Amino acid sequence: MKCKLTPQLSSDDWKDFCSRFHFSPADLPYIKAIYTALLPLVESCAYYSLDQNLDGISLPHYAYGFVTLGNGIDELSELYLDHEQIQEAYIVDCVSLLLLSKAYAEFAHVIEDQSGLSLAELSFLGDTYSLDLLPQIYERLAPDAIGLTEGQMLLPLKTAALILHLDTNTHADLRQLCNTCSTFLSFQKISSPGLAAYLWCHADIPYNIAF
């Protein structure tokens, strides 16, 4: 199955953007201008399945899928880098991370609505579940807008594979249910999808980011 996602930043998302990503407050109008320019390039969607048919996962209820922002953001970032506009490329990365975190939340709500179950935990491959599941998930979902390289890299770059543990009981707010947070601080560098998960859960915490 496939669903369109429409992640956007709200006024609250801008309140601590500069402190979180170490920009001067004077840069915010320029950052917002880049956001306005990139938003039409976002073609976010999710490919997913509610079938419990993955080898190696024994949960009674789960869903799995890919969430992507599409190729446009990658192309804009590459364009800036080609012109040695490093700050602009960094701004695109920062904004796209927040957009990806919004897409995760939107996707989780889609799964809850369609399954009639509640999200108990959101996991990313490489954390609770092995990256060895990636080819199997890719084969089952056959996402036409997402590629998988021989090195098991997903393209576009702002794409993640997720396992959503579902339950009949209602759980806490979605932001408390991402298991990436338990391992995030063990790494000096982390992929954009994983970082977006951490941003999603800890929107109030400023920190340094290493790409």
Regions found by a protein language model. Give the residues of each.
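Active-site helix-to-loop segments that bind/position phosphate- or nucleotide-bearing substrates
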Residues: 1-84, 88, 159, 205-211
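Short secondary-structure junctions and interdomain/linker hinges
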Residues: 38-49, 98, 102, 106, ...
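General structural feature for long, well-ordered alpha-helical segments within catalytic domains
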Residues: 30, 34-38, 103, 107, ...
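General "foldedness" signal
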Residues: 52, 79-81, 184, 192-195
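Catalytic cores of large soluble enzymes that bind and process phosphate-bearing ligands
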Residues: 23-26, 30, 91-95, 99, ...
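Short terminal or interdomain "cap/linker" segment that borders an active site or interface and mediates
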Residues: 118-190, 196-211
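Conserved mixed alpha/beta catalytic, RNA-binding, or beta-rich assembly cores of soluble enzyme
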Residues: 59-126
